[in-house]
């Protein structure tokens, strides 16, 4: 029986590595109609036809990465699982750099004009999620955007999709982004647009 007083902790890299070693596509990113529709809604929800540099947090095996790569000069796609990153890199996308990184501590260097956080925030505990939000703010160009997308059903993760989305939105609210809800049904998809010149984290 779980002790209700036990602190919530972010899921470790080993959780995901075990998943991908057992099944290279454990969440059916390649075949699920849900994933296909969500990817389309995500790319349709981008406000610009093209971006300079995109960061995708939690890229998994790179299915969404391939779509995002068509909309930018450079994509940095990160995940905590070495097995998932190796599978993603097999696509040999010329403008994509796939990196093994466990966030928030191993945050990529450089700045981005779009940061995509899709089906990833509920794996973090509240403290790590807020630290991730701060790092995203620091790395985002003035006039940049963030896309958040999360399933709203029951989870056995540290947070629900709604909790994770709202906690992250609260953490970035000090920069006063324009918040646009693009979809809410079984998943929530939102875009946050920041003012040009407002690049102080």
Which residues does each PLM region occupy?
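Class I (Rossmann-like) S-adenosyl-L-methionine-dependent methyltransferase catalytic domain
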Residues: 1-57, 61-110, 124-141, 145-201
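A conserved beta-strand element that flanks and buttresses the S-adenosyl-L-methionine
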Residues: 116
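Hydrophobic adenine-recognition pocket in adenosine-nucleotide-binding enzymes
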Residues: 120
């Amino acid at each position: 029986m779980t002790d209700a007083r036990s602190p919530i902790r972010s899921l470790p890299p080993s959780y995901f590595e075990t998943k991908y070693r057992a099944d290279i596509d454990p969440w059916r990113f390649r075949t699920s109609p849900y994933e296909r529709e969500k990817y389309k809604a995500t790319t349709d929800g981008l406000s610009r036809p093209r971006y300079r540099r995109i960061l995708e947090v939690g890229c998994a095996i790179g299915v969404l990465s391939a779509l995002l790569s068509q909309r930018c000069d450079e994509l940095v796609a990160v995940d905590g699982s070495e097995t998932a990153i190796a599978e993603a890199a097999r696509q040999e996308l010329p403008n994509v750099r796939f990196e093994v990184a466990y966030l928030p501590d191993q945050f990529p260097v450089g700045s981005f004009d779009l940061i995509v956080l899709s089906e990833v925030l509920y794996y973090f505990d509240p403290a790590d999620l807020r630290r991730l939000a701060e790092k995203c703010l620091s790395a985002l160009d003035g006039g940049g955007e963030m896309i958040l997308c999360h399933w709203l059903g029951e989870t056995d993760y540290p947070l629900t999709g709604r909790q994770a989305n709202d906690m992250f939105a609260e953490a970035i609210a000090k920069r006063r982004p324009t918040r646009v809800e693009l979809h809410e049904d079984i998943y929530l998809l939102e875009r946050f647009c920041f003012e040009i010149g407002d690049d102080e984290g």
